[in-house]
């Protein structure tokens, strides 16, 4: 999980979703997991 000021899709399978007001990237590749905050 990377915590970044701006989250971006890294590959076509990445999805940006909002959970409890936090932007997250979920992906099949665990190295692509990110969250904003």
Swiss-Prot record:
Transmembrane region(s): none
Source domain of life: Bacteria
One family name in Pfam for this protein: Ribosomal_L36
Keywords recorded for this protein, A-Z: Ribonucleoprotein, Ribosomal protein
A Gene Ontology molecular function term of the record: structural constituent of ribosome
GO CC terms: cytoplasm; ribonucleoprotein complex; ribosome
UniProt-listed PROSITE patterns: RIBOSOMAL_L36
Family, as annotated: Belongs to the bacterial ribosomal protein bL36 family.
Protein name, as recorded: Large ribosomal subunit protein bL36
Source species: Maridesulfovibrio salexigens (strain ATCC 14822 / DSM 2638 / NCIMB 8403 / VKM B-1763)
């Amino acid at each position: 999980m990377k915590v970044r000021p701006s989250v971006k899709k890294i590959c076509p399978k990445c999805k940006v979703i909002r959970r409890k007001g936090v932007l997250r990237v979920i992906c099949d590749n665990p190295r692509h997991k990110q969250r904003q905050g």
